[in-house]
């Protein structure tokens, strides 16, 4: 029987008590300055073409240079990518990713950002669901993608970028990877990005509106198969505008890209926000605590939005010193549960407070943030740190299982606002289940106090958040159960001092079968991204189930774990 949910706003929403928490510079209502992130980039290009748009390690790239790279990609793809088509981007944090975004959007295409850690086994679903016409790949990611593309069997225009592209000669020794000096022929079926520099740049550009889909960002589905949230250009611009205003970003700021560009945080809180605020973005190939500390110190980075594990890694680095991060003052964290002990530790070391934030892939990044300059309260009932208050134009309510609007009791958090995705790509069932009358059912359990502060106390969904990456248990279970020795498997998240949570698998073997933890982890590594591979595997006789046969994950989570 379907649940009936009232559309009447809860009391806290009616009074908008959280607006009273806003910084004086944040209005109660916001309108994006641009209709698309592409328009924001074009404005930066028109105003300051020879100003530095980004720093890749120590190597600068101006708006004009980034525009040239994007136009060459656009010209190469023009014959294969029509308006409404999809372009896959599977790469680490390099300027080529930004060039691919611009090129795809100028062609009127949607971008499919894919984690650089995906295996060919995982990629087959993404390709069959998104059906891209073209792809920009990092050199290290090309083998897995090309193998999956061959199995998929559709024609693709593939361009491969090297990690050393755009680096000054003096900068190359600092790179963290070995796959930077590839030369000679490109991987089979692909072309080097560097070879496109001989092409005549394209100049045409599609007309984009705020309701057009900008991104297909994949997140976990209830069946274990990832689903793609349809984030529109309007969604992206609104969220970027919020970050610009909430973080008080001005022309003197320099934004550090600490999140991957395959993740909604990297795409919105870093790339789009830098363009809307017209400020330079500092990036490295991938996150490394020592490299981040060097970049902050060298470039005078002032702000970032990062998983709490990024701050922990920098604190724990042997070269960490407060003077190195003295300019780093506008800090936010989200994507994984934030511990007050880590916030306190960073503040004790630097004098700077880390502000909490909360959002989903489906909400195009943050919907709740702690107002800049304020401290998040701790929920006396659960002990969790508040995720903040809803950002402008965002409605939030807490409902019971029967749809009853709750006061300060714990219930499911639902949201409505201009940053909410328009649904899931080619997935009517999950769209209908999660998006209802303009409200997004988050599956997260939380409460709101009388002052408008929100607290997340649990997840109604069983998603595991490891170092900011979401891991859906059923996907891991399906991978494990494909092993001939395994009868069934169940995966839960267990506490991890560094990652926040880490996957643990409970495995039931077929009678007479044998397997070891090492063997099964190796099996998973061939099929899953590294962060999804269960760190712990426990062999059990059976899995706990109720009378209807439903798996009781709570009992597994509550078991003692060492």
What is the predicted function of each stretch?
Residues 180-218, 225, 248-254, 407:
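Conserved pre-ATP/AMP-binding loop-to-beta segment of ANL
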Residues 237-254, 262-303, 317:
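Conserved AMP-binding/adenylation subdomain of ANL enzymes
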Residues 393-414, 450-451, 513-517, 552:
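Conserved beta-loop-beta connector loops within the AMP-binding
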Residues 62-64, 205, 214-238:
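Conserved AMP-binding A3 loop
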């Amino acid at each position: 029987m379907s649940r009936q949910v009232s559309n009447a706003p809860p009391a806290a929403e009616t009074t908008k008590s959280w607006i009273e928490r806003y910084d004086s510079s944040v209005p109660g209502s916001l309108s994006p300055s641009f209709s698309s992130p592409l328009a924001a980039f074009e404005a930066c290009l028109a105003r300051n073409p020879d100003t530095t748009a980004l720093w890749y390690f120590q190597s600068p790239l101006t708006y004009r240079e980034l525009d040239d790279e994007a136009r060459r990609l656009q010209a190469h793809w023009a014959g294969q990518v029509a308006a409404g088509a999809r372009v896959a981007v599977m790469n680490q944090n390099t300027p080529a990713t930004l060039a691919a975004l611009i090129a795809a959007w100028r062609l009127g295409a949607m971008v499919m950002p894919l984690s650089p850690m995906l295996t060919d086994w995982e990629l087959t679903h993404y390709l069959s669901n998104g059906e891209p016409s073209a792809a920009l790949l990092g050199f290290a990611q090309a083998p897995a993608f090309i193998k999956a593309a061959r199995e998929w069997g559709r024609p693709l225009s593939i361009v491969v970028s090297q990690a050393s592209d755009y680096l000054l000669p003096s900068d190359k020794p600092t790179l963290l990877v070995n796959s930077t000096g590839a030369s000679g022929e490109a991987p089979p079926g692909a072309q080097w990005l560097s070879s496109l520099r001989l092409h005549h740049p394209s100049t045409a550009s599609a007309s984009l509106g705020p309701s057009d889909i900008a991104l297909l960002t994949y997140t976990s589905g209830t069946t274990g198969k990832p689903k793609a949230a349809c984030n529109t250009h309007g969604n992206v611009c609104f969220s970027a505008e919020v970050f610009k205003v909430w973080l008080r970003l001005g022309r003197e700021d320099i934004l550090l890209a600490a999140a991957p560009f395959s993740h909604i945080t990297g795409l919105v809180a870093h790339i789009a926000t830098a363009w809307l605020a017209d400020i330079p973005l500092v990036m490295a190939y991938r996150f490394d605590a020592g490299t981040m500390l060097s970049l902050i110190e060298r470039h005078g980075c002032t702000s970032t939005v990062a998983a709490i594990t990024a701050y922990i890694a920098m604190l724990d680095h042997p070269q960490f010193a407060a003077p190195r991060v003295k300019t780093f003052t506008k800090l936010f964290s989200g994507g994984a549960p934030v511990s007050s002990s880590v916030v306190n530790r960073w503040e004790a070391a630097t004098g700077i407070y880390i502000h909490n934030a909360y959002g989903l892939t489906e909400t195009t990044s943050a919907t709740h943030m702690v107002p800049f300059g304020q401290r998040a309260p701790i929920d006396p009932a659960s002990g969790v740190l508040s995720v903040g208050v809803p950002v402008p134009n965002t409605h939030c309510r807490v409902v019971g299982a029967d749809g009853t609007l709750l006061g300060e009791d714990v219930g499911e958090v639902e949201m409505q606002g201009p940053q909410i995705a328009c649904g899931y790509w080619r997935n009517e069932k999950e769209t209908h289940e999660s998006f209802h009358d303009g409200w997004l059912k988050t599956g997260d359990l939380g409460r709101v106090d009388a002052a408008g502060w929100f607290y997340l106390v649990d997840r109604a969904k069983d998603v595991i958040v490891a170092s900011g990456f979401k891991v859906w248990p059923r996907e891991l279970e399906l991978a494990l159960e494909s092993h001939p020795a395994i009868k069934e498997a169940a995966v839960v998240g267990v506490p991890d001092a560094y990652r926040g949570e880490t996957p643990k698998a409970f495995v039931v073997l077929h009678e007479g079968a044998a397997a070891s933890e090492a063997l099964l982890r190796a099996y998973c590594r061939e099929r899953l991204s590294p962060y999804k591979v269960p760190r712990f595997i426990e062999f059990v006789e059976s899995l706990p189930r109720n009378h209807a046969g439903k798996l009781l994950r709570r009992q597994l989570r509550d078991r003692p774990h060492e």
